[in-house]
């Protein structure tokens, strides 16, 4: 939280900003009493940036999106389970002060989980909304704050999802995305090309997809890309979501990257970018323990890096 504040209890309901309520009343079909996703705050200094990926880049919408949405950033949202939240509060690591004071590595409970999702911004364009619904996108009410501090309210379509559970010592990393994403998201190259996933679906995921898609027709355009759960398991070595790790899929491993989550009072957060190719390559195998001498491991939870100093 801003200024390293202690969070309210997990079940505390956040009030919908008045600007969002006012804008929502003008959009056909919006339920102002319903759920709205907060898709980030892009103002300078915000602790809740909704567009930046691990490599510092944003993924843009393009290809078959309407002209008004062309170049709009794909937006991100993160949730954590109550046991994850409670452990953070109990350990007093909700701010940077608590993390810097650690004298031992963290060990989240086996019931801990996090969920990270990516969303295509629709706004109030009903034609684009119908197009995405036809392509099997789950649609939600949402809002975000732009760089100028202005609120934007509308609809958003779910394009990707990481599900992270501590069902094993190394956590279980499961990733899904809509198979029509190449129609609506593009690479950051020149010229921009349709964004595709180069890491899956893996061979193990394909029969799971066939069963799931048959049983759940309304969500049948979503597919499991793959699962990682054990650092001793050789395959899949690479696992990425084209919406969440767009530009570095060839150097993406959920498990190996998050295994580097660590903090040192002398060196701050562990730098998981390897020195090759200008420091934009990330580990695809778990680094040796010797690399973490002087660090306290954060039990794979890199989201703790958002913690702010108490002020």
What are these model-predicted stretches?
Residues 1-256, 261-311:
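Conserved small-residue
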């Amino acid at each position: 939280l801003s200024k390293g504040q202690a969070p309210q209890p997990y079940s505390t309901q956040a009030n919908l900003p008045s600007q969002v309520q006012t804008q929502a009343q003008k959009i056909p079909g919006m339920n102002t009493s319903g759920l709205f996703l907060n898709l980030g705050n892009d103002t300078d200094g915000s602790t809740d940036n909704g567009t930046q990926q691990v490599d510092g880049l944003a993924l843009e919408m393009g290809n078959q999106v309407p002209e008004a949405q062309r170049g709009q950033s794909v937006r991100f949202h993160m949730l954590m389970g109550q046991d994850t939240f409670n452990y953070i509060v109990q350990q007093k690591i909700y701010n940077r002060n608590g993390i810097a004071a650690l004298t031992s590595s963290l060990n989240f409970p086996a019931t801990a989980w996090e969920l990270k999702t990516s969303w295509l911004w629709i706004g109030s364009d009903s034609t684009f909304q119908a197009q995405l619904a036809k392509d099997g996108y789950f649609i939600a009410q949402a809002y975000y704050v732009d760089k100028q501090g202005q609120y934007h309210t509308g609809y958003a379509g779910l394009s990707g999802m990481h599900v992270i559970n501590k069902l094993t010592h190394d956590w279980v990393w499961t990733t899904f995305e809509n198979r029509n994403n190449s129609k609506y998201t593009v690479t950051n190259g020149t010229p921009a090309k349709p964004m595709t996933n180069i890491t899956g679906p893996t061979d193990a995921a394909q029969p799971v997809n066939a069963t799931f898609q048959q049983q759940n027709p309304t969500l049948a355009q979503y597919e499991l890309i793959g699962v990682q759960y054990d650092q001793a398991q050789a395959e899949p070595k690479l696992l990425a979501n084209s919406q969440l790790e767009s530009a570095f899929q060839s150097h993406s491993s959920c498990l190996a990257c998050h295994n580097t989550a660590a903090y040192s009072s002398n060196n701050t957060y562990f730098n998981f970018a390897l020195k090759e190719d200008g420091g934009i390559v990330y580990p695809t195998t778990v680094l040796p323990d010797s690399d973490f001498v002087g660090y306290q491991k954060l039990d794979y939870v890199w989201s703790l890096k958002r913690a702010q100093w108490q002020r």
